Amino acid sequence: MSHLKLDTLHVQRSPRGSRRSSRSSGRSSACSSGSISPVPIIPIISISHDGDESESESEIETEPARLFQRRMSIKCTNNLAAIIKEGFLLKHTWSFQRWRRRYFPLKRNMLFYAKDEKCDVFDDIDLSDLCYFECGIKNVNHSFQIITPTRSLVLCAESRREMEDWLGSLKTATAPQRPRGDSFLIEQHDILSNHHHWYATSHARPTYCNVCRDALSGVTSHGLSCEVCKCKVHKRCAAKSIANCKWTTLASVGKDIIEQADGSIIMPHQWMEGNLPVSSMCAVCKKTCGSVLRLQDWRCLWCRATVHVACRPQMAVACPIGPAKLSVVPPTSVHSISTDDAWDVASPKGNFSPLLVFVNSKSGDNQGVKFLRRFKQLLNPAQVFDLISTGPSLGLRLFRHFEMFRILVCSGDGSVGWVLSEIDRFNMHKQCQVAVMPLGTGNDLARVLGWGSSCDDDTHLPQILERYESASTKMLDRWSIMVFEKAIPVPKTPKMSISTEQEAMLTGMVTSANHHLRFIVETSDTQTLISSTRNLCDTVDDLVCRISEHHKDDEQLAVKCEILRQKLNMLLDALQEEEMGAHSGDDLIATIRSLIARSIPVTPGSSAYLLNPNISIEKTEKDQINTKERRNSRSLRSSEKEALQCRANSVKRAIYNVVEHSEPGRPKRYQRKLSITPFEALKLPTTASGESSPCTSPLPIIPPINIISPTMETSRLTCISPLPDTRRDSVDENFFNSINLPAPRQFADSRRSSGVPEVIQEIEEGANGETMYRRCRMSLTGGANIDDAGNRLSPCSDGGENTPTERKVDFLRVPIHTGEPIVDPLCDYRPHEVFERTYYMTREMDKDKEKDKENDKTVEIDKEKDNCVAKEDSIPAERLVHTCNLQVPGVVVTPNTQNVYSSASITIIDTDAQTTTEQSSSDDLGGEASDILSAISNEECSVASEIFDKQDAGQTVGDIIQNMDASNFTHIDSPETSDETEAMPGESIMDDISSVLGHDITYALQDNTLTDDTTTLCSEHAGPPKPPRKKSLSALSRTQAHPRRRNSSPPRIARLARMDSDDNPQQFGFENIVFEIDNRCDDQKMREPPRYCSLAQFVEGNDIARQSFKQLMLEQQQRDGDNDTEYPEQQQTPTNKGPNSLATTSEDELSAQTAIKIEIHDIDATVRNINSSMKPNTILTTSTSPTKKSGHGQDISVVVRPPTPLRGDSIKPTASLMPVSSGGAMAVSMNCSGMLGVRAMNASEIRRHSSHAPGLAVREFDKDKDRRHSGFNPNQLTLDPEHARFLSSSPAASRRISCGSLFKKKNKKIATKRSYGLFSVRFFVVAEPDFRLATLALIRPLIPLPNEALPNLQSLKGSKSSLFMGSTLFGFDHLASAEKDKDEKGGKDKDKTPTEETNRKLPIINPLVRLPNWPNLANGGGFISKCLLANADTLCAAVSPLMDPDETLLAGYHEKCVMNNYFGIGIDAKISLDFHNKREEHPEKCRSRARNYMWYGVLGSKQLLQKTCKNLEQRVQLECDGQRIPLPELQGIVILNIPSFMGGTNFWGSSTKKDDIFLPPSFDDRVLEVVAVFGSVQMAASRLINLQHHRIAQCQSVQINILGDEEIPIQVDGEAWLQPPGMIRILHKNRVQMLCRNRSLELSLKSWQEKQRQHSISIQRDASSTASEHANSTDEVISERECYVLLNFIEAVSSLVKWVKFLIISHPALQHDLYEVACRASEALESIHPQGKLLEGPSLRTKLVEVIDSSRQLYDDACTLLRDRGHSLILREDLETKLSAALANMEMELKKCSVQKCIDGKLRAYFNVLAPNEESDGRRKSRPFWVRLRSGSTAGQQAFKPPLTNTREAASNWSVNEVVTWLETMQLSEYVDSFLKNDIRGKELLTLGRRDLKDLGVVKVGHVKRILQAIKDLSEN
């Protein structure tokens, strides 16, 4: 290297830099860039990972030295182009295997690097001619090398994902410019470009470069190899290689395309030269090809055939593709990529089932990389995708146009779930079948499907592909994990947390800053404001300074600190502007100005550990707004207040941004909490007491005490389980206290506050047990008070304070006073039409209410009561009209009647509190009034049902709906019942009715005139009814006098007087129609039959998908008394005096009871009422049974028909459906829909059970959800096309209340008899698809339809989704139980008895639940709770909304993930989560399957000591199919879909008992198995023994309620995370086709293939013999091989003639004819070899015909003679032996001879060289010849043949065919032809040596060893 001139370097750098540059220039890969003179140096290329090459390539290779250039760039000149990727990588320094960390920015066609990003000078590399590849096969250290014509760099990334990102970025940087630059086109270009994919590797034999044809350097032939086509090149030659890699599409085939005459394209061979595998055989000449001395011969990349250069022209043109032809997508079939990013495919001829392969390259210690490359070599490279780099979407998009294809996922269970999720996204379930190759750790799904637990060897991949081709298909159930998370209000410190001193100090700083921000926004005291402002500035200053100490070089952190300083200054500016008006000139302004002038250091700070963001986010939005109202004492304008609050929010977010950026590696669960919504950034706390702030406010400060107090231990939450309160002992009182999900305006219910700050304050009830609700109304914007004229009202000046002892507070009335301009915080979520409509509706309703109030005779009583309330809140009652309030009916809870709380328009009934002698299992119920009210407000509190008054005749439907008051018709989950929502004024449940029933039915319903307080049902021992009846009449007359009034409730004081009367037995009023309150003495209860109740069904956690409304239509039952009706004709709504009683049955028949007796008291009066109003009064399907009543018209029996989903356009006006007659039975029967409503009703009362939680029903529409529809009001949930499709799509939609009942008991005595007649019971079912029939069923339930319109009940057998399946109220389960079980279980239980079928009805609960060690939840139901669902369908069918499980179960939830294998919560998820964290921290420790199992064992043992998930049963609740399951002490719950858990454990256990109540577990039965986990010891023991005592249930849906405020670990298919409190539902999502291994089919196919191969071998033998015959038939010359057979034939004939003649001579008594035959045979034999010489030419074959005929005759006659006379012959022993051998040889030789007639008509003889298997001498000697002759039959001969023995003696007698069979048994059939050509018999086989085998073509070392060992075994035997 003396020729190098170092003085030619002219780099203007420091001497150190110059010396480093000089040294670097001597080493090729270390050269950089810059303006530097080119220096010729010797390239030194090495890869440190392989460690194989210690010398440079130039020392071995003879090519001249290359010129390497080094260039440098200045930083300022490199800022012109955009940076594609930048980051730090490790760069190899080529000295002592060292690595240096360097900063690399990548731009288009240029790569730069320097020590760090702040360097001014960068080395640059031109990437215009780039070659990059991975280093090594498995590439453990994630290194890759880039080679250009001038540079070579080895770089190392931190992870394989980062390495893939860099390689992808290099593709992007070097790819040509495209108009569309998305990732799909980049990957598409990579697929279609035919570029090689290099990786560095070594070789075991000499290998040659395909570019320069020279040998690769080094002893191990180290170089680059293409992972697809195995092209070998030098590293220096990689950039010069042409793009001739394996074809992918038709375009890549190019000029090699072969097109036939018919236009079809033939798949040609794709040849690669040289480097053939060992022992390659030419496909043409069958000789060895390839060489280790040079690059010669060819191999096809598709069919793997090898040929010589000279034989290649003789090769067939069409390529057979190879053994994997069924799975390969030929490149000639893929024509192009269409506009939808999918292939345009032309299916090839023949069988075609393409295979799409996804490989996780990280799986199995990077074993996936080997499989990825192997698959690309076997298949089309465009069929194989790496999940790490491209994901599943690219491959699925490309394969979208295939009709059917298979998917092979080579990874663990997590990647399988990823692929299945993408299949869901593309909706490709029907066209793909998924198989799994186990490369992960657990591989549970692969175990269940039969593919084994692991697959580590890629050498047998072709055989594995054949297994997947013969696989069978099964359906895998997939389950949606739906979660409903609740916010955690107060964060709790982890139990075992170790905090550093610095972390605690920074946490205190952030907490202090948050408190000061609250004081600044909240306080009205000047001194407090000054102090808080100064402390805030000091705290922020200290925080920034401390963080900047450890992060001095972080520019981004410095920017965030600067933003924090600016936002703090903006806050001070806003505070100065705010206080300028009221406090001008005081010291506050001076202090603020001084603080603004101060400068906060800009230096970025160090990081603290992640602080919990919920320190100041624990309050709800309503507290924020209420606190803002209490701050009105400073008389600030609204805009200034909002500006100040926004500035405070900005400062708070800036503080969190600084802290978050200072520690980028914090857990994701905390980063999720840092996402602060705009209305949740600063939730200001309110004062907990009644004391006001130092600065007095004109408004009282209402204490924000929730009805659900966090301090009350006995309170109960609103649970979602339909179970009594006593079953929920572990419920957290804060559950769902802060749920508030914002919804977009397209989905938001306008009655709910989806993100709107709530203003309803909740007051804890005092000791008097009485709460009063004031009627209020809130403005439409939620922030301004508007009077009747639309002007903004001024704040009230009256002030007052509330003391904690004054409990009687109007807590629903909170006036809101704001400034001029107000920006609605939800303007983006609410349509503009809402504001206009609600504003005018509010103003009109205010005017109407003022007129009504003036005419109200009891207004003085109301004022008196209002004044009582005003004493507490200091607000005059007369100002209530002018205050923005919320319309809420009053409620007075009286402690006189236990569990019943009534008022003028609402009755609250505690359904769970036990009033009977049956005590609850909970000790917390009863006693304090606050406890009762706490339970009432959250569980039992229901609002008055809506009442329709009679409208004016001239009103239209729009007027009716627009003028409907919210107090008349109330949503079940409306603001009046929810402590979390507020209502928009003017809206009512009419919107929901319109959305469900349509405007026609809504208009028809309004004809009913229903009163509010008519007592219709009470105790049988009724008290004096006159006083309440008079009040009822007065209320009714007042209602008729004011038809415009929507609220028909009577005066409150009258109602209170009636409700407070202790001697009034009818105080329950209308409530008893729906509920029977058991509040009487025991003897009275024993005398009376039980009354059964109904319940308005809530969907768990939701509001029944927008369709919840409460309008009960009640039926009258026949009574024995005479006081049945009191006013039948005086008014349109007759009032019934006596109470109705439901038909009573025994308790066993209770669940099946459906009939209600409806009696028509006066037919004529009823008909007159019907004629006066043609509209139906209700939408109701009812049921009665035939009864008889004296003195009245004929009784009518009505059958309850279940509700059917309706389309709005299918509902017809009732007047047009049926003519009406003025009298007669037919007219009554045809118009009896009017009878159903011709009676007075009390205030509708619906019990709100504890299972009905308020929720948010968020409806997600289709892609056209944003499109406007004609006549669509955005504020009304009307029947738009989405709703219509929703109402009619699902056949499972129903209004049945008992769908989720826990009290379903099967009653097999249900009568299904039909009776016919005009007024007889007619029981029929309305078919779902028939909407016209459904309309008739709902609107006219008593119309006698023709028999042909009645569907057959037997048709329910085939309908799984029928409305009646699963409900015992209609008793249809027994019709289809067997068929249903057969359909769902695949017929696996078809042999079960009916009793067993009944016991196996899902859910199947473990009987161990009833044992004493399990908690008892079955005794806490109570009488009322059991009665609620008895006749729920019958009573509530009219008002029960259409509940579609497909819709309502998902409302308010979001899909977290999809479960394929199993779901775990508790200890198993904790172990998986710990392992996941360990793998993320130390991936090098978790690279092998065995090591991962070890880690699982260690972590499981850790949980054995720590018991982190102890007492999990107190933190979760479990429900299976809606039934609450009691839980013992456990640490986890596992829900299984497949019988394999966490690495092959059968956690459910195998069923061995015949009387097992559970179904056999399967993954295709739509059934889940629920298992309890008691500890890690049980999990370990379940791997060894069969455990079953931990089984819980089998069900079809699971719900888990997570209580408390702590997160619980959860895992799905091995992927774990921490789940916050809330609800989790596991529902069936769909099914996917999975490929299962079919071993029986594999065996059958293998045997069939073996037979086919044997048959092909025999055909080849025949063909070869026939070919030889035809080849010799032209010249009639006997070949050498035939001559050898001829000599044996002559020897056999001569021997037989000799011994037959000797036999005749020895026994003269034998026939002499045989001697003559022998003589003729001898003469014929002499004729073919006259004078000892064989004839030549065609005459020989002609003469041989005569010899064969005579020899066959001699053989036959000799055999016949010996068979006939053999028993009497006495032969010498030697003669016997010789004669037997002669006959046997003659028989064998005759089989080789054949006589054929030629074209010229002459007969010629031919010899078959490949004769059939012959019997060896050893077998012949075992039995004398004549004994075999005496057997007389061939069957006998075959029966006595001994088996072939592998002894040396037997082997020496083997023929060629037996040797061939021996080879085939050793699976060496490729050498059969060679052994046949060389005529290797048994004797020759035993003497074969290694050299002989080589001459026979056996060159593989393994095959040679196997053959030699087998020969040795034969010789030894």
Swiss-Prot record:
| Residue intervals of every Phorbol-ester/DAG-type zinc finger in the record | 195-245, 268-319
The residues covered by the PH domain are: 82-175
Q: Which EC number applies?
A: 2.7.1.107
What's in the keyword line of the UniProt record? ATP-binding, Cytoplasm, Kinase, Metal-binding, Nucleotide-binding, Phosphoprotein, Repeat, Transferase, Zinc, Zinc-finger
* Disordered as annotated region, ranges: 1-37, 1015-1053, 1114-1149, 1380-1399
Domain SAM: residue ranges: 1854-1917
Biased segments, Basic and acidic residues type: 1-10
**Positions with biased composition (Low complexity):** 23-37
- Recorded catalytic activity of this chain's protein: a 1,2-diacyl-sn-glycerol + ATP = a 1,2-diacyl-sn-glycero-3-phosphate + ADP + H(+)
The entry lists its GO molecular-function terms as:
ATP binding; ATP-dependent diacylglycerol kinase activity; zinc ion binding
GO cellular component term, pick one = cytoplasm
Listed GO biological process terms = glycerolipid metabolic process; phospholipase C-activating G protein-coupled receptor signaling pathway
- Sequence ranges assigned to domain DAGKc in this UniProt record: 350-486
Q: Where is the composition biased (Polar residues)?
A: 1128-1145
Write down the PANTHER family for this protein, in alphabetical order.
DIACYLGLYCEROL KINASE (PTHR11255), DIACYLGLYCEROL KINASE ETA (PTHR11255:SF109)
| Function recorded in the entry | Phosphorylates diacylglycerol (DAG) to generate phosphatidic acid (PA).
**What does the similarity note say?**
Belongs to the eukaryotic diacylglycerol kinase family.
Name the UniProt record assigns to this protein: Diacylglycerol kinase eta
